[in-house]
Amino acid sequence: MIHLLDLCEKLNSVDTKNINMFGVSRGGMMTYETLREDRRIHKAVVVAGVADCTMNYEEREDMRSLLTELIGGTPEQLPEEYSRRSAVAWADEINTPLLIFHTTEDDKVSIKQADKLVKQLKKNQKDYEYVTFESNIHGDLRKTDVEKIRKWLQT
């Protein structure tokens, strides 16, 4: 993502003061990581984003072998690697306005992850909005949410 931002700066047709980012699920995790590493994003929207890799490991038994392989070990073996990938551990470093959506019954990424992140964002007085609604569909958005995103990005 950061290389794409570098490319955008070289293009005359891109308003580099108004680059927004949108991520769903693991893409949400990547959005959080980009916001931590780079300040060029104007606003970001995250839907059902992974915010706590250790919690994700604990809650998703079906993903444990994949996470262990990708990260190189378990949370017990490599706590710093899981923390490095978890926005809840460094929410104080996020300085980009965030619009976060999460469904209450998401069975892929627990709403507890979003709640935990929002608690840290609030504690650190960050600029965010948090929208939850009843649904068990991972990454679900309602028509009204799409309109909210459009308006929010334009302000």
Question: What are these model-derived regions, one by one?
Answer:
Residues 107-113:
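Conserved alpha/beta-hydrolase "acid-adjacent" motif
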Residues 28-39:
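Short glycine-enriched nucleophile-adjacent loop
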Residues 45-55:
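Active-site nucleophile loop of the alpha/beta-hydrolase fold
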